[in-house]
Amino acid sequence: MSREDELLEKLDECENATAFLQVSNKIINLKLKALLPKVFVQDDLVKEYAVDPLLKEDGPLATTDVVSKLMFAMGKISLETYADIGLYDQVLEFVVTQSEKVEFADDMIYDFIKNQSVLSSQQDSFYLESINQLKFSSFESFSQMRYEALIKTVLKLSCEMLIERIEGEINQ
């Protein structure tokens, strides 16, 4: 089982949105770094002396933000994909600065989901419609549990869909 697959399974174990965002951002970073060598000249010498040093843990391409900017600048990922990667990164930066863990039911997580282009396509808009129905329903305690479970499910789906889109755009 790959590190990415292990982390995808760990998403189900996350107790709150803060933990979820930390794991999902690791997954996105791993996927970007795994695909990054494909955007460069495919030459062993170039890979050994230029690409590999860039990808080291302490190299200039260590952060998700820098890697996604490079891929976007090279025309390898779309603006929508770049924006979604940036949104994951920005929301993570925000939640880790909070004194308390951010919960799945937090309005900020709702806004995060609403602003993802990967979920705003016509075919995937039913996820947002389902969330809206539960968020604004009147069955408080029952709906709250279902709402949080739905948020977690949609977050996991959005992460998986973003990973698939990144891979599809890089490999085309």
Ranges and model annotations:
Residues 1-72, 76-172:
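Amphipathic alpha-helical interface elements
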